[in-house]
From Swiss-Prot:
The lineage of its organism: Eukaryota, Fungi, Dikarya, Ascomycota, Saccharomycotina. Keywords: Chromosome, Cytoplasm, DNA damage, DNA repair, DNA-binding, Nucleus, Telomere, Ubl conjugation, Ubl conjugation pathway. It comes from the Eukaryota. Recruits the ubiquitination machinery to RNA polymerase II for polyubiquitination, removal and degradation, when the transcription-coupled repair (TCR) factor RAD26 fails to efficiently displace stalled RNA polymerase II. Also involved in telomere length regulation. Binds DNA. GO terms for biological process: positive regulation of transcription initiation by RNA polymerase II; protein ubiquitination; regulation of protein complex stability; telomere maintenance; transcription-coupled nucleotide-excision repair; ubiquitin-dependent protein catabolic process. This is RNA polymerase II degradation factor 1. The gene is DEF1. Residues 53-343, 438-457, 494-537, 552-592 are annotated as: Disordered. Ubiquitinated. Proteolytically cleaved by the proteasome in response to transcription stress; the resulting N-terminal form constitutes the activated nuclear form and the C-terminal portion is degraded. Belongs to the DEF1 family. Residues 582-592 have a biased composition (Polar residues). Its main location: cytoplasm. It is found in: Cytoplasm; Nucleus; Chromosome, Telomere. It comes from Candida glabrata (strain ATCC 2001 / BCRC 20586 / JCM 3761 / NBRC 0622 / NRRL Y-65 / CBS 138) (Yeast).
Length: 592
């Protein structure tokens, strides 16, 4: 044990940043090895503290480890004498620091510097092997054995030698900061477009700084090379720069035009949408419309990127005002048009109108989607819940005549804002944007005519893009009314009966088609009414096939339900979760 204690004591003096426990474990693990070998392992980094991360990049110093063995003690005992820069990294015991001739404040306390201390110590030892020689080892071994102080003159000589080796080593070995900073050579080549006199002065200063910092011997050769390269490239680039300037000037000139044309673009889009309706009434307006169509073509050709974001905001405000005025103007025209039944549009005119509106919408889509949003509400996370904005609007009673309410699941959402007559007060003109193509196709058109007194959902809406999004998606959209099972979660059909007694419950049953006979009847009703009204869109055909497929499954479910007592199932169905999720609902809230 005494030998182990002696080894630990000497190692503690040699490596004050190691804990005694770590050194004790190390010595006990390697009982048979000599002290010098343990010291060498620590200095080369083969052995580290238990909580230390190995840095394998330092292994390039491994071939020099044989020369480190004899100097390992000297590197650590004299590391604080090697100048102020290296002192905080390699601490040593306080008595050496106090007695050394160089003014250094090194504490004996163990520092938390990780393997940088031990591994870089090995590199120091390797660098010192050529210069410091045997005097350093002799002095260090004497200091370790006697724990006395050798003569001050020797230590001063050693300190001078160590300082000289450090300066040499700093020239060879760059620090991390020096490695990370970009080298000064390519910089003047990149900045060749700047003015020449300022550039030359900058190069002189940079070259002088670099000669001071990194001690380059060939700075002037570098300067000459860089000057030659620059002259060649400037000769090449002078014509190129002139052409660049010309193109830049040409690009800068048409920039004010699209900004001025944005406002007529709004008018042109709306005019293109209302044009087919207004042609029969207002023939004297045709020259204006032709002018605005020309402006539309110019706008499509002009670069859309030109207007900066700040001006687009003001343009969108002006565009909103213009839209409101124009809608107020077009509303009496539309009512006049409704009063004259002789002027009803034929199918060909409807198709032409739909095409014109589709073109206008395609051009306006980017503008409508983004610039008109109210800035505070433009983030999409608020609308993750489908039923979010519908509680704020008063609920519309579902039309329940002899006609099943949810005949067209993909159009029922749009009934709220497909009204042709009502002016929209928000920045987006939903009628001209998307309404007419859908009404042209949709069999719900008579219903939208009936409900045209209701204010559309898009009016006063702070997210116009929300309405566009839902109009273009054919999936199950939220419908209106509690009877039609409108909750953000999925409820069961029985909840409609239990919430409302009497007539309303029966209507809810009939709408949701919860019972077998009613389901079959209303399903056949749906098919006949759909085929009678108009040709089906492919989405509706898909829906009908889907419902027919569901009906087979529902009949099987029905047989099972008739066998089991229904009274037990109803309280379970009351619970909110998906336990009572049934596929026979015609108003599924989720995406199916």
């Amino acid at each position: 044990m005494s030998s182990v204690q002696n080894k630990v004591e000497t190692l503690v003096e040699l490596f004050p940043d190691w804990k005694r426990e770590d050194l004790l474990e190390l010595v006990q693990e390697e009982k048979d090895t000599e002290l010098e070998i343990i010291v060498e392992k620590i200095t080369t980094g083969k052995v580290t503290k238990w909580d230390e991360v190995k840095k394998p990049k330092r292994e390039r110093h491994a071939p020099e480890a044989s020369s480190v063995r004899t100097y390992s003690s000297s590197t650590h005992s004299h590391s604080a004498a090697s100048g102020g820069a290296a002192a905080p990294r390699y601490k040593k015991s306080g008595r050496f620091a106090g007695n050394s001739g160089v003014s250094n404040t090194a504490t004996g306390s163990s520092t938390s510097t990780s393997s940088g201390t031990s591994t870089s110590a090995s590199s120091h030892g390797a660098a010192q092997s050529a210069s410091s020689g045997k005097n350093a080892t002799a002095a260090a071994q004497a200091a370790v054995k006697k724990t006395g102080v050798p003569a001050g003159t020797k230590e001063e000589k050693i300190a001078q030698r160590l300082n000289s080796t450090h300066t040499q080593e700093e020239r060879k070995k760059m620090s991390w900061a020096a490695i990370a900073t970009p080298k000064p050579k390519p910089k003047p080549v990149q900045k060749k477009k700047e003015e020449e006199p300022a550039q030359e002065s900058q190069e002189d200063t940079k070259a002088s700084e670099s000669s001071k910092e990194s001690a380059l011997e060939n700075v002037e050769d570098l300067k000459n090379e860089v000057d030659n390269i620059e002259k060649e490239q400037e000769k090449k680039e002078e014509p190129a720069q002139e052409t660049e300037k010309e193109t830049v000037e040409k690009e800068q000139e048409p920039q004010p035009q699209p900004q001025e044309q944005e406002q007529p673009q709004e008018q042109a889009q709306e005019q293109a949408a209302n044009e087919q309706q207004q042609q029969e009434q207002q023939q004297p307006q045709q020259p204006q419309q032709e002018q605005q169509e020309q402006q539309l073509a110019q706008e499509a050709a002009a670069p859309a990127e030109a207007a900066p974001a700040s001006k687009q905001g003001s343009v969108s405000e002006a565009a909103q005002q213009q839209q409101q005025q124009q809608q107020q103007q077009t509303a009496p025209q539309q009512t006049a048009q409704q009063q004259q039944p002789a002027q009803q549009l034929t199918d060909a005119q409807l198709q032409a109108q739909a095409q014109a509106q589709a073109q206008a919408q395609a051009q306006a889509q980017q503008y409508y989607m983004y610039q008109n949003q109210f800035p505070g509400y433009s983030y999409p996370g608020m609308y993750d819940m489908q039923g979010y904005a519908y509680g704020q609007q008063y609920q519309q009673p579902t039309p329940m005549g002899g006609h099943p309410a949810m005949v067209n699941a993909q159009f029922s959402m749009q009934q709220g804002y497909m009204n042709a007559g009502t002016p929209v007060s928000a920045g987006v003109d939903l009628n001209t944007a998307t309404a007419a193509p859908n009404t042209a196709q949709s069999p719900v058109a008579p219903h939208t005519q009936q409900q045209s007194q209701q204010q559309p959902y898009g009016a006063g809406s702070f997210m116009p893009y929300y309405a566009h999004f839902y109009q273009q998606y054919p999936y199950g959209q939220p419908q209106y009314g509690v009877a039609a099972n409108q909750y953000p979660y999925q409820t069961t059909k029985s909840s409609g009966q239990n919430l409302y007694g009497g007539e309303y419950g029966q209507q809810a049953q009939q709408d949701a088609q919860a019972k077998g006979v009613q389901r079959n009847d209303s399903h056949s009703e749906q098919q006949t009414s759909d085929s009678a009204q108009q040709q089906l869109t492919p989405q509706q055909i898909q829906l009908q096939q889907y419902y027919q497929y569901q009906q087979q499954q529902q009949q099987q479910q029905q047989q099972q339900q008739q066998q089991a007592p229904q009274q037990q199932q109803q309280p379970n169905a009351q619970q909110y979760g998906y336990s009572g999720y049934d596929y026979n609902t015609k108003s599924t809230n989720g995406f199916y």
